[in-house]
């Protein structure tokens, strides 16, 4: 069961990483837009 659980955890981590990357990119885009508005 443990051997089957390991491969299952890998895609979940990848999905989490992609989600975090998406949030980070949105945050960066927001900062860029705010800087444009301030300028």
UniProtKB/Swiss-Prot annotation:
Q: How does it sit in the membrane?
A: Single-pass membrane protein
Query: Which keywords does this chain's UniProt record carry?
Result: Membrane, Photosynthesis, Photosystem II, Reaction center, Thylakoid, Transmembrane, Transmembrane helix
- One short Pfam name that applies is PsbL
Q: One biological process GO term for this chain?
A: photosynthesis
Q: Where in the cell is it found?
A: Cellular thylakoid membrane
What is one cellular component GO term in this UniProt entry?
Answer: photosystem II reaction center
Q: Which residues cross the membrane?
A: 18-38
Which residues lie in coiled coils? none
Q: Which domain of life is it from?
A: Bacteria
Grouped into one coarse class, the protein's main location is membrane
Its biological function?
One of the components of the core complex of photosystem II (PSII). PSII is a light-driven water:plastoquinone oxidoreductase that uses light energy to abstract electrons from H(2)O, generating O(2) and a proton gradient subsequently used for ATP formation. It consists of a core antenna complex that captures photons, and an electron transfer chain that converts photonic excitation into a charge separation. This subunit is found at the monomer-monomer interface and is required for correct PSII assembly and/or dimerization.
The entry assigns this protein to a family as follows: Belongs to the PsbL family.
Against HAMAP family, the record matches this protein to: PSII_PsbL
> Protein name, please?
Photosystem II reaction center protein L
Organism from which the protein derives: Prochlorococcus marinus (strain MIT 9301)
The organism's lineage is: Bacteria, Bacillati, Cyanobacteriota, Cyanophyceae, Synechococcales
């Amino acid at each position: 069961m443990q051997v089957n659980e390991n491969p299952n955890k890998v895609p979940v981590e990848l999905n989490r990483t992609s989600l975090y990357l998406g949030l980070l990119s949105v945050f960066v885009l927001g900062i860029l837009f705010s800087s444009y508005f301030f300028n």
